[in-house]
């Protein structure tokens, strides 16, 4: 099992950060995908448990199912389909408020198994680079929303 763990400080409250990470429609702006659609609504929230979101990257489709949805602190998902030789991909996102009340820490942990032996180093770097890009995009989007809320 491969593991990638990232943490970043977000310049916004836990609620503002939650509003960004839990809304599938915003992911297109910071994931490098052309569009993110909702294939199936979750319960009880549209983006909640059971929701299936689809990331469109040209002809490529990545499908994810939300498995945990606990506003405003935790969301988890598992990858249903991915054009990489990976299996059992899942991620957990946790927002921890800072003592100042105006910022929080995003912890993003991802796990996956290799479908092709001996590809761990390369695939781990590819996945880590993409997750770093997404987390950086989330930080920018959260800061913009925090600024407009002031």
Question: What are the residue ranges of the model-derived segments?
Answer:
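Hydrophobic ligand-binding cavity/cleft-lining segments
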Residues: 1-42, 150
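A generic structural signal for beta-strand entry/edge sites
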Residues: 1-3, 72-74, 101-105
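Short, surface-exposed coil-to-beta transition loops
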Residues: 3-5, 60-64, 87-91
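Generic structural detector for well-ordered beta-strands
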Residues: 7-11, 54-56, 65, 94
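Beta-strand/loop substructures that line and gate deep hydrophobic ligand-binding cavities in soluble
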Residues: 81-133, 140, 149
């Amino acid at each position: 099992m491969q593991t990638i763990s990232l943490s970043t400080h977000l310049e916004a409250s836990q609620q503002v950060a939650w509003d960004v990470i839990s809304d599938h429609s915003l992911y297109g702006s910071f994931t490098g995908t052309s569009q993110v659609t909702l294939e199936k609504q979750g319960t009880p929230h549209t983006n909640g448990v059971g929701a299936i979101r689809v990331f469109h990257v040209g002809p490529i489709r990545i499908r994810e199912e939300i498995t945990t949805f606990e506003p405003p602190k935790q969301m988890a998902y598992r990858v249903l389909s991915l054009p990489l030789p990976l299996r059992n991909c899942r991620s957990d996102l946790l927002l921890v408020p800072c003592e100042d009340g105006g910022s929080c820490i995003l912890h993003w942990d991802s796990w996956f198994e290799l479908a092709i032996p001996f590809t761990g180093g390369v695939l781990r770097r590819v996945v880590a680079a993409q997750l770093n890009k997404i987390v950086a995009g989330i930080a920018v989007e959260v800061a913009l929303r925090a600024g407009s809320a002031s």
